[in-house]
């Protein structure tokens, strides 16, 4: 892989998330029936310092689920800063299914997250943060998430149409020397940043919102790339008028990425990490003014003091925001877009996570995994 590739290469993922209900719909979803969480207080009284393993059981989609969960220590440092310590990230698997992985955040007794059962990805979404707009916690297959044609496209071209394809696309692009399992053998520290616009949307829950998204990203990367995501730092800027504030009022995605890179370069608490990722509440746009852009990142930029940066919009729901972030972090890891002319993965035609348009897949293609494996092998911070 070229040693200078990261200097100028960046890639943008785009889709219209400003009015998510208009761009994503579900052909089927169900509430969680007979939900029980044992080993932790469902009223949120369990504290981070004493959090232990839990079992989560429920019925849905014609089957019974038994989730075996342990606190996700990679994210607990960030979680300790949350008010009341009632937000706990968990990782684990389905009982008796070693090819599965689970990432769940339990906030005030309410679960949300992702389940990979060995063949398909399932999303659990809480009231107020689910695609269906339901007033209860729901579960659905990502394959049942329908994306409006043309609403999720990238400047590099291409469009995809369902949620299952987004995961498949991501995994296909990351997937060679890795196994579908809950564990990971290496790790990378990712510094998380939120701008004032993100804080304006999520308010006091901004850190919780970032934590939930990164817990899902960790599931994807741990299982498919063999690299776990550690989060030693979450910085939430709440006032754009208070100095020092690193971002201008620009909504141009490339310009905002440059500002993030400058901030990372000059901030020791960020550049000590392998990567920095910004969640923005802005409706960012491309150089041509296309506001369907939702993410951008430097490609092949692991461990780079300035260029180890990427950003994604945090204006949608947790599941799809996490897929966007995973896509952009995939670029940081060296994965180009699948099926794009003159790309190293130009011949990849499936619906995978690194397709130029969000499609509901969380799977990296084999080509993506091969490309990332090269960068991982050379990365000093992994």
Model-derived features with residue positions:
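Active-site-proximal beta-strand/loop segments in catalytic clefts of secreted hydrolases
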Residues: 94, 106-107, 116-118, 127, ...
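Fold-level signature of zinc-dependent metallopeptidase catalytic domains
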Residues: 21-42, 135-303, 316-319
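Bacterial N-terminal signal peptides that target proteins for export
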Residues: 1-8
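Short, solvent-exposed loop/turn and secondary-structure capping segments
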Residues: 126-127, 287-292, 341
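The catalytic-center signature of Zn2+-dependent metalloproteases
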Residues: 232-255, 301-374, 378
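N-terminal signal peptide c-region/cleavage motif recognized by signal peptidases
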Residues: 16-18
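Divalent metal-coordination and catalytic microenvironments
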Residues: 92, 217, 277, 330, ...
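N-terminal prosegments of processed precursors
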Residues: 21-130, 254-258, 381
């Amino acid at each position: 892989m070229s040693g200078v590739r990261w200097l100028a290469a960046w890639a943008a993922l785009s889709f219209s998330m400003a009015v998510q209900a208009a761009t994503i719909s579900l052909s089927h979803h169900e509430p969680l029936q007979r939900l029980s969480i044992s080993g932790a207080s469902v009223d949120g009284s369990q504290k981070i310092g004493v959090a232990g393993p839990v079992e989560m059981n429920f019925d849905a989609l014609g089957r019974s689920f038994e989730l075996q969960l342990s606190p996700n220590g990679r994210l607990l440092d960030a979680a300790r800063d949350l008010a009341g310590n009632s937000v706990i990230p968990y990782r684990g698997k389905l009982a008796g299914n070693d090819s599965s992985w689970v990432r769940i955040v339990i906030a005030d007794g309410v679960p949300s997250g992702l389940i990979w059962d060995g063949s398909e990805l399932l999303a659990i979404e809480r009231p107020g943060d689910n695609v269906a707009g339901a007033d209860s916690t729901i579960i659905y297959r990502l394959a049942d998430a329908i994306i409006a044609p043309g609403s999720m496209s990238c400047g590099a071209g291409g469009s995809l149409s369902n949620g299952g394809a987004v995961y498949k696309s991501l995994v296909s692009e990351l997937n060679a020397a890795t196994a579908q399992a809950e564990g990971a053998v290496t790790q990378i520290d990712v510094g998380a940043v939120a701008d004032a616009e993100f804080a304006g949307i999520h308010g006091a829950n901004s850190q919780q919102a970032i934590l939930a998204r990164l817990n899902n990203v960790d599931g994807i990367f741990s299982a498919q790339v063999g690299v776990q995501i550690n989060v030693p730092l979450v910085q939430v800027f709440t006032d754009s008028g208070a100095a020092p504030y690193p971002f201008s009022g620009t909504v141009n995605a490339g310009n905002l990425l440059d500002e993030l890179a400058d901030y990372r370069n000059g901030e020791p608490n960020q550049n000590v990490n392998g990567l920095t990722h910004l969640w923005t509440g802005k409706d960012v746009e491309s150089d041509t003014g296309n506001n369907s852009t939702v993410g951008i990142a430097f490609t092949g930029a692991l461990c780079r003091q300035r260029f180890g940066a990427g950003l994604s919009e945090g204006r949608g729901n947790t599941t799809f925001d996490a897929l966007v972030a995973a896509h952009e972090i995939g670029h940081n890891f060296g994965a180009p877009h699948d099926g794009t002319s003159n790309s190293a993965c130009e011949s990849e035609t499936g619906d995978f996570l690194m397709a130029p348009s969000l499609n509901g897949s969380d799977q990296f293609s084999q080509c993506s995994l091969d490309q990332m494996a090269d960068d991982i092998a050379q990365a000093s911070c992994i």
